[in-house]
Amino acid sequence: MKIIELIMMEDEKRAGEDTISLVYDPAIEENFVALSKQQEGRVALSSEYMRMTLSDADKRIVTGAALVPNKPIYRNDGGDEYYIYFSKDTTRKASESFLKNGYQRSTNLEHEEGDRLKGVSVVESWIIEDEVNDKSRFYKMNLPVGTWMVSMKIDNDEVWKEYIKEGKVRGFSIEGWFVDKMKTKTKTEQARLK
């Protein structure tokens, strides 16, 4: 089965990621954690494997990987099976482009095009620089250097109660414009990744 490295397009206005979708089954196979405030003021961590215990003072923040570098991601386009991956460099460029272009509020559910969620916003973004001394370790995540992490604030009551708390969505999935690195040498073919 072929393996394709995707890179950023040269057209900066269309290049890279432009949406983060909340999904049940993220292609990067990494789920987020939902943060809630306990009565004593301590932070509790919850994931898809644990039933969340939330007080009235929910933080309503989910934190997880948006993109993991060099992780093979299975694709099947009309019977054409292959894997894609993003290098550390492309992952960093995608994260920078996302913020630079102001896409922090560009979120949807399960890649529903044109259906942008209100009251959902990326409030934190970082690249893991050190596997041991990174904030992701605090959240019990074991991810490689170069991973793009995000925290999303969920002020939308419906999304928080019906999707996050009920476990209907468990992770992030990116959408954006990328190209096959090998094909850029001969002909630029762009692909909208979802």
Q: What is the meaning of each model-derived region?
A:
Residues 1-194:
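Signature of dsDNA virion morphogenesis modules
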